[in-house]
UniProtKB/Swiss-Prot annotation:
Name listed for the protein in its UniProt record: Beta-galactosidase
Class of this enzyme: hydrolase
Annotated GO biological process: lactose catabolic process
Catalysed reactions, as listed in the record: Hydrolysis of terminal non-reducing beta-D-galactose residues in beta-D-galactosides
PROSITE patterns to which the protein is assigned, alphabetical: GLYCOSYL_HYDROL_F2_1 (PS00719), GLYCOSYL_HYDROL_F2_2 (PS00608)
Pfam family name, one: Glyco_hydro_2
Top-rank taxon: Bacteria
Active site: 460 (proton donor), 527 (nucleophile)
GO function terms (MF aspect): beta-galactosidase activity; carbohydrate binding
Keyword Nucleotidyltransferase in annotation: no
């Protein structure tokens, strides 16, 4: 019976697929064994990617309704690229919202209503000839991803309709195809019933954004296959069961031959059978199979050969498989008999230029970056990914939570409050078919990937009977995997939906409370460590739970990549834009930028902490040797080389490499083989220990460091006193105090109340005098907990102070000048800054904060520092500090004490909104030099200090919402701090920095540093 399209389907919850073919596995198939072994692009597929003709309408009423008719000429239309988003190719505009629906405030709607006047329509046309090898064969079309709903016509005839943006939609074109030119028409709507189910935290696009291709099938064809590669209870026998659904042009006998090859190409098992049915199951077993895990992703290759009744080979299907067993044992998730810990990250499919159109190269870069930084798991937040992603996870080794395309966040949570009065799907069983369709489509496509350990019922959609039934479906069709859903946290009546306790952004204490109160399920954080801007502070508090509580089984950082889009400012310069930058309203602004890599895929400084805390092998050195703790479940350390290095005051003394063997789940203490000489000098020693790859791997080259540990110790006392010799001349002017030595002069101003000149060899170093600084440019997390509101008085105190006293003391060998400052915020806050000038031209600076009386009434300090400016020519930095990447009090676990160089402009991290960045803790020395290697050196004296050196002041950064708003660079701004508060990261909407990383206003603070000329 012929079906006619109807635009009313867009708002009909009962219509989500018309004439769409049943979902099936994502296997490939070939005509010969030789092809199947090489797996080239399939000859029975023909890509329709590329330029299509295109028309854009702002709503259905203005679309060209009859464009699909053969007599309607579309060849003069514009071109658009497929795959691609409409909004990134010059039509409409991208919009970013998090939880609210994109029409909020413009239309008052309830499901399944959609806006009538704001529903952009993209009309696509592709003219094609059927490839010769597909002529006289069945012809099908596959759309791998179309957002959010679309209609298809071929040669004027209606073909079908589909919703669900993130799983394939396939249709039979055979009845409509003709010889010669065919006219394929696709009408894509941005809003549909499906829009209510796709309220994920991402940019709202529309269009054909994944591959489109034609395909044909042979006379005997594996339409669907379900490969179950399991293990028996002893884990010693692999049980391979493959269920096939066949398509046959004639109901004649089929011979199926199955051959299983190991990774070296040897046949390890075979089976064959004959069948007259459309369903068949082929079984075989393997003794002592190599097992699949993220540590060692061993894949076998199954070849299925289909012969017709004459014995002619018709089709060959290659399929990679991994033997593994994933299950709950005594309320603990185990893989191949071992307790697993997910060291994971959430990943949106994203490219800063093309949005959710990602290439294989993008995927490879992501997976290699993850592996290099010890990430072992990924959650496909919050929709099924491009099919190729799972193949790469199988091959490279990543554990996957595969999440169905469901999020209805705006239907139950408003402004952070749980209010589910009109939540969908909830218990509204009329929504079950459209929701279940998404679950079925994901399962059927992805079911054969060993990397997928867990099915997820979606994200942030509250809970109810519908989602519970989705969970029951997954369990009924696939007992080899577990089921995840976090939303039951808000509705415990549906707790059975999830096999694990899953929470978002729970504090470490809350997690411990769960784990110490008779837990019934293992715990994972499906989202934690909200990595928005300068964040990820305190991550160690979560990873420390891994060995403390067996039922704590890890978590997934939010998230992998900044969802920021390249845009040009008014002068044509590119920058990464966020919500609102395209005139999109409503919007959630920069909340889209939460990545541990930037939108250009370069790792952010936060990745330094991730790599260290996610190490599977821990190196714990002391002065005599190193404890190697191999926390891998299945692999020993034979693939790595141990390297250890001894440094004295940052200078390398000794280095050695050796092989090391530590079995999985074991630890070994290895003594160092040091040379005796050079180890008794007074000073600071640092031992670095590293494990590096012996050979190239798929994901990294030989020499890549997989694990690191360090030990710092001191020999002898710290040299605090200066013994510089020479004469100093002191000039007491009416306004200034001048101190002069050989080839240098220092000037202190009574009027300014500070050091105003430091003149070395005819060059002025001070462009702006040092002043107390209490403020840092607010980070995204600071903004989330209203730091400017609560602690804004320190912003004011940093801009205005009063020098109430100046004292000068002349002694043999040095001259001291002490300034005392008061602040309008409180008459009980006092800061003293003392400068001691020595005959060699060096200065010792001591800064003291006192507020012991009355300080308890003041808010916490963002930092306690001195800030001054040098000329911008001093832009070369040489550090001996914790690094090499930026680090903070609560994000320094992964930093190492080392020497490194960078430029001032590079110290500013590339967060999409300017904010505090570039800090280094544990600073011993930092040289600030010009191109000739001249300048100053800032050195700690009693305790290591913190330094942040930037082209901009905290206040310039504070006032800018985008990098292009920052002024031209005129100075090098030096902030030397005794302490700065941590950056936090439990969440970005109110979670405070943990207490031990906060600067309380009622504590006395002091730091000391030297300024030396270079």
């Amino acid at each position: 019976m012929k079906t006619h399209s109807n635009v009313s389907w867009l708002r009909d919850v009962n219509v989500f697929a018309v004439n769409r073919l049943p979902a099936h596995s994502d296997h490939v198939y070939y005509e010969t064994v030789e092809e199947a072994k090489k797996e080239p692009p399939m000859s029975m597929r023909h890509s329709l990617n590329g330029h299509w003709k295109f028309h854009y309408a702002i709503n259905p009423n203005t679309r060209p309704k009859e464009f699909y008719q053969l007599g309607f000429d579309c060849k003069c239309w514009d071109d658009i690229l497929v795959p691609g988003h409409i909004q990134l190719q010059g039509y409409g505009k991208p919009q970013y919202v998090n939880t609210m629906y994109p029409w909020d405030g413009h239309h008052h709607l309830r499901p399944p209503e959609i806006p009538e006047d704001d529903n952009p329509v993209g009309s696509y046309v592709k003219y094609f000839d059927i490839p010769n090898n597909m002529s006289n064969h069945p012809l099908f079309i596959s759309f791998q991803g179309v957002e959010t709903a679309f209609y298809v016509w071929l040669n004027g005839e209606f073909v079908g309709y589909s919703e669900d943006s993130f799983t394939p939609a396939e249709f039979d074109l055979t009845p409509y195809a003709v010889e010669g030119e065919n006219k394929l028409c696709v009408e894509v709507y941005q809003r549909s019933t499906g829009s209510w189910l796709e309220d994920q935290d991402f940019w709202r696009f529309s269009g054909i954004f994944r591959d489109v291709y034609l395909y044909t099938i042979p006379n005997i064809h594996v339409y669907d296959m379900h490969v179950r590669a399991d293990l028996d209870r002893s884990l010693q026998t692999g049980i391979l069961e493959t269920t096939l659904e066949l398509k046959r042009s004639q109901e004649k006998e089929v011979m199926i031959v199955a051959e299983l090859y190991d990774a070296e190409g040897a046949v390890v098992a075979t089976a064959d059978m004959k069948t007259n049915q459309d369903q068949a199951t082929v079984s075989m077993s393997v003794d002592s199979p190599a097992l699949w895990s993220a540590e060692d992703p061993y894949l076998y290759k199954l070849f299925l050969k289909l012969f017709d009744e004459n014995g002619t080979l018709v089709e060959v299907v290659p399929q990679k498989i991994g033997f593994r067993r994933f299950e709950l044992v005594n309320n603990i998730m185990t893989l191949n008999g071992k307790r697993i810990v997910f060291k994971g990250v959430n990943r949106h499919e994203f490219n800063g230029r093309t949005g959710r159109v990602v290439t294989k190269e993008d995927m490879l870069e992501d997976i290699k970056t993850m592996k290099k930084h010890n990430i072992n798991a990924v959650r496909t937040s919050h929709y099924p990914n491009n099919s190729e992603w799972y193949q790469l996870c199988d091959e490279y080794g990543l554990y996957v939570i595969d999440e169905m395309n469901l999020e209805t966040h705006g239907s139950w949570q408003k402004l952070g409050k749980v209010e589910p009065s009109w939540n969908i799907p909830g218990n509204h069983l009329e929504w079950e078919p459209i929701v279940m369709d998404r679950a079925v489509s994901m399962f059927e496509r992805d079911k054969n990937h060993p990397s997928i350990l867990i099915w997820s019922c979606g994200n942030e959609s509250y809970a109810g009977e519908v989602i519970l039934n989705v969970s029951r479906y997954f369990k009924s069709v696939d007992p080899s995997r577990l089921v995840h859903y976090e939303g039951v946290f808000h509705a415990r009546a549906y707790d059975a939906t999830s096999d694990m306790e899953s929470r978002m952004y729970a504090k470490p204490k809350d997690i411990e409370d769960y784990l110490t109160n008779d837990p019934k399920k293992p715990y994972i954080s499906c989202e934690y460590m909200h990595a928005m801007g300068n964040s990820l502070g305190g991550m160690h508090k979560y990873t420390e739970l891994e060995q403390k509580y067996p039922m704590y089984q890890g978590g997934f950082i939010w998230d992998y990549i900044d969802q920021a889009l390249l845009k040009k400012d008014r002068y044509g310069k590119e920058y990464f834009a966020y919500g609102g930058d395209f005139g999109d309203r409503p919007t959630d602004y920069s909340f889209c930028a939460n990545g541990i890599v930037y939108a250009d895929r370069k790792p952010s400084p936060k990745m330094q902490e991730v790599k260290f805390l996610y190490q599977n092998i821990k190196l714990v050195p002391d002065r005599e040797g190193v404890l190697v703790k191999n926390e891998n479940l299945f692999t020993d350390t034979s693939a790595y080389q141990l390297e250890y290095v001894l440094y004295w005051e940052g200078t390398e003394l000794y280095r050695k490499k050796q092989d090391v063997f530590v079995a999985p789940q074991e630890e070994v203490y290895l003594p160092f083989d040091w040379l005796e000489q050079g180890m008794n000098e007074s000073g600071e020693y640092c031992i670095h220990t590293m494990l590096t790859l012996k050979q190239d791997q798929l994901w990294a080259e030989k020499g890549h460091e997989v694990a690191f540990g360090q030990h710092v110790y001191r020999m002898g006392a710290i040299q605090k006193e200066r013994n510089a010799r020479g004469a100093l001349k002191v000039v007491h002017g009416d306004v200034n105090i001048g101190i002069h030595g050989e080839d240098f002069s220092v000037l202190f101003s009574k009027a300014v109340g500070s050091l105003v000149s430091l003149h070395y060899a005819g060059k002025e170093m001070i462009e702006q005098p040092p002043m107390p600084l209490f403020w840092r440019a607010t980070t995204d997390n600071d903004k989330g907990c209203s730091q400017l509101y609560h602690s804004g008085i320190w912003y004011a105190a940093s801009l205005a102070r009063k020098c109430v006293n100046m004292e000068v003391e002349e002694k043999p060998g040095h001259v001291s000048v002490l300034f005392t400052y008061h602040f309008a915020i409180s008459d009980r806050v006092e800061v003293k800054v003392g400068y001691t000038v020595f005959p060699d031209g060096s200065l010792r600076v001591r800064s003291t904060y006192q507020a012991s009386k009355g300080g308890e009434t003041l808010p916490q300090l963002p930092m306690f520092a001195l800030s001054f400016k040098l000329p911008a020519d001093y832009e070369q930095l040489e550090w001996y500090a914790l690094g090499p990447e930026e680090n903070y009090a609560d994000r320094a676990t992964g930093a190492r004490l080392c020497t490194f160089k960078n430029k001032v402009e590079d110290s500013l991290s590339q967060y999409v909104t300017p904010q505090e960045s570039g800090n280094r803790t544990g600073v011993r020395t930092v040289k600030i030099l010009d191109a000739n290697g001249q300048g100053i050196e800032v050195c700690s004296v009693e305790e290591p200090i913190e330094c942040q050196i930037s082209p901009y002041t905290a206040f310039e950064l504070e006032q800018a919402s985008h990098p292009y708003e920052l002024p031209n660079v005129h100075y090098t701004v030096v902030n030397v701090a005794g302490k700065q508060m941590g950056v936090g990261g439990d969440d970005s909407w109110g979670a405070p920095v943990h207490d031990e990383y906060v600067l309380k206003a009622d504590q006395d603070l002091e730091f000391v540093f030297d300024i030396n000329r270079v």
